[in-house]
């Protein structure tokens, strides 16, 4: 056989063997601690690793276990806590220690703590020590499957010592004893004290005092600045302690704007009250017919409101609106010339009683007539209505009183003159305008000549005055209206409430 052919066949066999080995190696899963992971995934997701390991090695029994990083734990690489059967199970890994170690140490530490959690959840942690036979059984099983090197204790001593930057040393005899030579090294600034479990033995055997000999650079300056910034006054600390002990809380005064019931400052002023009341009254008169009794009730309500709102400071309340208010009201609301529209109708500004077929010629009303009602006719007034005294006294809280008197003694209510009615003013204005212009009050709808029997009957007929509700002869109603309206204007003086 040709030698070249023999060499070629040998080379081919070697090549086939190598390819078979490569194929077998490719079919095998990559180890969890393979060095290639350091380049592919140097900082893996902790939650993703936990879920993957739980399904692969622990049959999904750790779904309710919590896993998280701890930024303050520097003494050990990881810890698993369990609150009892059916309680919370939590795994915490030290971020300060493991961030300085390769990815292999993170995977092995996580699997180590997951074995503890599995024993807790399955209630199989009956070993006297945490790393007994049950723990070692699962540890060897996972090491064979993954090629990892899970151990009982970690070897991160250099990293742990790196974070122990607060050193104390005893000045007693123990500073010459092995293995510590009187040193206490801690990651936190907590000096040795009675809270340490070995303190009692140290006091018996040594009795020395621990003196701090080392701390991180600029630690004292940082601590002083933080203390000054966070320092609170003694009063604030005492108040906080009182609140924690359940004592009475300090009362903080109210700094806003409050309202006191019954205070004069909280009630609207008298001028605003009367102005708004007059506008509302005028609106009501334009929409419906108000009777005299309804006006009296509103007047009583107004006086009561003023007395309740102003108990201490008496104010001068003017019942008459100002000229500007009168102009506004007159522009919006038409004038009514007859006070009682139910009993009278308007005929060219003169009140004519409803139901009469014809009336005599009316004489022009003279504002200067001074005619008194005879006592005999005053006795003929309607006795069915309740009469009130001729004067009413309104007393304020300060003791001031104002007497409102009437010219006519048969008024129905003592508060009638407190506010002038819009109908009375408009009736008086209409009569004065017609008198000044020289026009007569003769009705255009009635015949110009009246018979003698009709004039005699009109002179004898008695009617009620719409202002004072007094009984007056029909032929003298105009003069009586002038006198009543003029009397109301003179008697309505400012009063104190």
UniProtKB/Swiss-Prot annotation:
Its cofactor is Zn(2+). InterPro entries: Rad18_UBZ4, Spartan, SprT-like_domain, SPRTN_ZBD. It comes from Mus musculus. Autocatalytically cleaved in response to double-stranded DNA-binding: autocatalytic cleavage takes place in trans and leads to inactivation. Monoubiquitinated; monoubiquitination promotes exclusion from chromatin. Deubiquitinated by VCPIP1: deubiquitination is required for subsequent acetylation and recruitment to chromatin and DNA damage sites. DNA-dependent metalloendopeptidase that mediates the proteolytic cleavage of covalent DNA-protein cross-links (DPCs) during DNA synthesis, thereby playing a key role in maintaining genomic integrity. DPCs are highly toxic DNA lesions that interfere with essential chromatin transactions, such as replication and transcription, and which are induced by reactive agents, such as UV light or formaldehyde. Associates with the DNA replication machinery and specifically removes DPCs during DNA synthesis. One of its GO terms (molecular function) is ubiquitin binding. Residues 383-404, 442-459 have a biased composition (Low complexity). This is DNA-dependent metalloprotease SPRTN. The record marks 228-229 as: Cleavage. A motif (Nuclear localization signal) lies at residues 413-424. One of its GO terms (cellular component) is nuclear speck. PANTHER family: DNA-DEPENDENT METALLOPROTEASE SPRTN. The PIP-box mediates the interaction with PCNA, while the UBZ4-type zinc finger mediates binding to 'Lys-48'- and 'Lys-63'-linked polyubiquitin. Residues 46-213 form the SprT-like domain. The active site is at residue 113. Zn(2+) 1 binds at residues 112, 116, 131. DNA-binding activates the protease activity: single-stranded DNA-binding specifically activates ability to cleave covalent DNA-protein cross-links (DPCs). In contrast, double-stranded DNA-binding specifically activates autocatalytic cleavage, and subsequent inactivation. It is found in: Nucleus; Chromosome. The modification N-acetylmethionine is found at residue 1. Pfam families: SprT-like, SPRTN_ZBD. A motif (PIP-box) lies at residues 326-333. A zinc finger (UBZ4-type) spans 462-489. Disruption phenotype: Embryonic lethality caused by genomic instability. Cells display impaired lesion bypass, incomplete DNA replication, formation of micronuclei and chromatin bridges and eventually cell death. Cells show an accumulation of DNA-protein cross-links (DPCs). Sprtn-haploinsufficient mice are viable but show accelerated aging, characterized by cataracts, lordokyphosis and cachexia at a young age. A motif (SHP-box) lies at residues 254-262. The modification Phosphoserine is found at residues 269, 384. Residues 344-459 are annotated as: Disordered.
